[in-house]
Amino acid sequence: GMDPIAVTAQEGPKTDKEKFKEVEQSLTWQLEMPNGLICEGKASYFEGMNYLKAEAEKGIFELTSAFNYSGQRGNTPEGAMDFKKVNQQAKQMDDFASAIKDNRPTPVPGEMGRRDVRIIQAIYKAMETGKRVLIEK
């Protein structure tokens, strides 16, 4: 996959200025990819957003209940997706333990988390400055 190279971001309006005086109520951002694609995202402490949607040449791909522990539903241009019920955290912890025991890399290394933190920091910097921010490698 590709990592984003730059981001712009905007803080949404605050409908409860007391509750959200020290934190954003909502935030939208646009990640620029090296090939020119733009990824638009939104997060909110107020709105109930629990879905993921991607628009591509061959149609729309989406997940509902995307961030729950179970109950995800997905649709593609070819029909519904079928998800087995799994405990994601248990599978990841078991894989970490096996990777250490078997002296092999894990598919989700710490570098991915560090990359994600850099992207999140760039999103907040873009929101605070109102400017396009390059994402450090």
Predicted regions located by residue number:
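Short polybasic amphipathic segments
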Residues: L52, F67-P77
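Rossmann-like dinucleotide-binding domain that binds NAD(P)(H)
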Residues: G1-I38, A43-M49, E111
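C-terminal helix-rich "cap/oligomerization" subdomain common to oxidoreductases
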Residues: P34, S98-K137
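Short, surface-exposed beta-strand-loop junctions and turns on beta-sheet-rich folds
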Residues: F46-G48, I60-F61, Y69-S70
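A generic structural motif
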Residues: E32-P34, E55, Q72
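Active-site loop of classical SDR/Rossmann-like NAD(P)-dependent oxidoreductases
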Residues: D82-D94
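Hydrophobic alpha-helical segments typical of transmembrane helices
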Residues: D3, Q92-D95, I100
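Short, mixed charged/polar active-site loops
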Residues: G36-I38, M49, I60, E78-A80, ...
